[in-house]
Amino acid sequence: SQLGRYRMRGMALMKKIPTFDDLVFLPGTLTRFVIEGYREKCETKTIIGPRCENPIELDIPVYITGMSFGALSYEAKTALARGATMAGSATCSGEGGMIPDERRYSEKWFYQCIQSRYGFNPHHAQLADGIEVFIGQGQKVGMGGHLMGQKVTDQVAEMRSLPAGIDQRSPARHPDWLGPDDLALKVQELRELTKNKVPIQLKLGAAKVYDDVRMAAKCDPDSIYLDGMEGSTGAGPHIAAANTGIPG
């Protein structure tokens, strides 16, 4: 109450939650065809948007998620773009628009459409290999973004058309839809913008997973991306980051 805002923090989840190291797997016996582990090929190639004219083909089912320029430095964004290309994977612009060098170094690149529309440019969207509609992220599901003023440099401010050095907040909801019917219209609008050449992906923070995924699927995206609560954030309310969401 003295600060007049949430107590903010960034980076990874601090509490201990289950990880992929805790997974166990059910082996095949009678009900599932058994394969020879040393002779059968393991295929990691992943295709996003096979219905599109230009689907995204990843060598591995992992890609660099959207992190904004501001939350990350120019050097970090471009280094991740180079690394993803070397790994046969993809990157995502995150909030705030396109860095030309990130696009140049990324062989496969998603352009993110976020609630605030900061830096969103339809011409840049047409340069992307895929469009990601940001609906939420795992560490602060149902909440908007917050970029601390000390990270809002002159270059970041110019890209977002906002003053430098001042905290920038993003709304929790997109301004042009109120429900799933409007989301379906937004997906169709982005298809028309990109002439149905590239995949449209929805990014959801994991919450009511079964119901949310069913509703998202009815909007006819090419892929649905669920973000777990350990997915980290540049800045978010500590109480929400520590105590809400579902482990990924």
Q: Which positions does each model-derived feature cover?
A:
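Carboxylate/His-rich catalytic cores and anion/metal-binding grooves
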Residues: 124-148, 210-227
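C-terminal helical cap(s) of enzyme catalytic domains, especially alpha/beta-barrels
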Residues: 108-110, 147-156, 233-248
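Internal alpha/beta core interface subdomains
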Residues: 74, 78, 87, 154-197
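Glycine-rich phosphate/ribose-binding loops and adjacent secondary-structure elements
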Residues: 174-248
